[in-house]
Amino acid sequence: LPPIRGVILSHDHYDHLDRAAIKALVPLVELFLAPLGVGDRLLAWGVPPGKVRQLDWWQDIEAGGLRLTATPAQHFSGRGLHDGNRTLWCSWVIESAELKLFFSGDSGYFDGFAEIGRRYGPFDLTMLETGAYNEHWPYVHMHPQQTLQAHRDLGGRWLLPIHNGTFDLAMHAWYEPFERILELATEHGVRVSTPMMGERIDLQAPHAGRRWWREVVDSETQVQGYGCC
């Protein structure tokens, strides 16, 4: 990896905060931005204090020509049996002179999206979770129809669905979030970008991207008729 100006963290769950990854990134990263308490974990892992900034909801910082604001999310935190909700979780607003971006982190659908939209929107691109959803935990992860509504609440121009295709945290198929959000987006006239993991996109002019998950050689997708070869 090249030198990295900053790393944004949303909360301390293992699928979002990996100790080995953080330690490997330290030599490359100028600044880690984290919600309250999460930065303390980085310090405990040996990250130099000068590289860590912790923010409460609605606090902002200027770095590298950007203004970054920690904004509310509806989720929870903790890494063990006895440390539940001792650290904060958040979403992020990222603003430059030309662009406004929103990163949801993990969140259930709540009226905070509309408030963030009123304060900071409209957004050129919203990066919103759609994945790991289930009817039994609607307050901490969004279903695709809620992701679409959050995008509209925020005043988003392009939607980039995140929190999918990696860790298997729910009962749905790994590719289902992509299919469902694209179906809903087509129905409601919402522009969606689905870059393959590791693929770059031009934030000034996002592209829809191909349905790459249908090309993955995987027994699960082949059963559903999406597999290749």
Residue ranges and their predicted role:
Residues L1-P2, A20, L55-G121, M197-C229:
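Core dinuclear metal-dependent hydrolase active-site scaffold
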Residues R5, L31, G37-D40, K100, ...:
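Cap/insert and terminal regions of metallo-dependent hydrolase folds
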Residues D18-P27, A170-E179, Q204-A205:
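Metal-dependent catalytic neighborhoods of phosphoester/phosphodiester hydrolases
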Residues L42-D56:
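Helix-loop-beta element that forms the nucleotide-linked donor phosphate-binding surface
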